Amino acid sequence: MSLQIDAVILAGGMARRMGGDDKGLVELNGKAMIEHTIERIKPQVKEILINANRNQTRYAEFGFTVLSDEHTGFLGPLAGMITAMGHTQADYLLVVPCDCPLLPRDLVARLLAAIEANDAELAVASDGEREQPVVMLLKPSLRESMTAFLEAGERKIDFWYAKHRFAVAAFTDQPNAFVNVNTPEQKQRLAAEINQS
């Protein structure tokens, strides 16, 4: 039996460091940032969900289901993950941010391999130096635990997953895979890298 894996692209933040611009819609090399992310993950999953708390109509134009946080008040990535976990019947949910246009083309395969090798409930990606808390593969059944954590006032994803059996998938062979865009300067650097990838 093959596993069903869906994905959620997190585009629900305030993007304060980008001057409030909606990061997923910022143009990079002629395409919205989220389009680069979609291109990277679409071949790896069955369904894609987009978590957005503004510009929902614009995000819907990409042809995927758009979900706004069930917990209001821009509570961070956990809120978007909880919402997506409640809208999938998949065995696993891939979580990625909207502003990582160089995500690995084998992201799901390696995260799943880490889960299976470690009998884990979830796997988090690492660039070899640090874990990337918003790049993970997890079981949607963890929604209840994550909801309780968020409703207790907690926000840090790594604090949440530390309470569970988690594995780390290291992508040391792709050191720039998780480079994201938080400032206009980073956007310029990334545009050059995309041209080379």
From Swiss-Prot:
Coiled coil: none annotated. The keyword GTP-binding applies. GO terms for biological process: bis(molybdopterin guanine dinucleotide)molybdenum biosynthetic process. GTP binds at L10, A11, G12, K23, N51, D69, D99. Belongs to the MobA family. Transfers a GMP moiety from GTP to Mo-molybdopterin (Mo-MPT) cofactor (Moco or molybdenum cofactor) to form Mo-molybdopterin guanine dinucleotide (Mo-MGD) cofactor. The N-terminal domain determines nucleotide recognition and specific binding, while the C-terminal domain determines the specific binding to the target protein. This is Molybdenum cofactor guanylyltransferase. It comes from Shewanella sp. (strain MR-7).
